[in-house]
């Protein structure tokens, strides 16, 4: 996702404590372009989410998201940076493109040591299905689809601002 972020230009990136740990684990923590504004999870109330109420955002991309984050979002629990941002985006009618990690009964995923087989639980797959029913939220099932939806959104916004 970092390479994709770096191609987008003027974007804000919210990095949760868990995401920061993962970036370090995968040795990607210093690869985000200096042009990107980064907000880190350093307060309980996530003050930076106030920008949603100032109409500064038109799109939220949540990628990649763990099964834990998906479950919390589906059930309205907003107790972390990621889940709070999703809740605020929904309340402010900000379009969301959501990329959950657990999207199929069997997956190959990249771990720090290489690819591993993963078998998401039934509850995780059910939560992804529920997420697909959320209004103004597009749930994508692959990185390729994520790229396509972001490109489509950018093109749509270009046309609407003409």
What are these regions (language model features)?
Residues 1-162:
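A cross-family phosphate/adenosyl-ligand binding-site feature
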């Amino acid at each position: 996702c970092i390479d994709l972020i770096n191609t987008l230009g003027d974007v804000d990136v919210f990095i949760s404590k868990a995401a920061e740990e993962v970036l370090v684990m995968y040795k990607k923590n210093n690869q985000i372009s200096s042009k990107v504004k980064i907000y880190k999870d350093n307060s309980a109330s996530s003050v930076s989410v106030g920008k949603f109420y100032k109409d500064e955002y038109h799109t939220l991309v949540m990628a990649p998201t763990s099964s834990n984050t998906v479950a919390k979002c589906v059930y309205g629990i907003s107790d972390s940076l990621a889940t709070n941002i999703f809740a605020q985006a929904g309340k402010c009618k900000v379009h969301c493109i959501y990329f959950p990690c657990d999207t199929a009964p069997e997956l190959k995923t990249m771990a720090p040591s290489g690819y591993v087989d993963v078998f998401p639980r039934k509850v995780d797959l059910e939560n992804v299905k529920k997420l697909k029913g959320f209004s103004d939220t597009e749930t994508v099932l692959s990185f390729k689809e994520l790229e396509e939806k972001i490109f489509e959104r950018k093109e749509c916004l270009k046309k609407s601002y003409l």
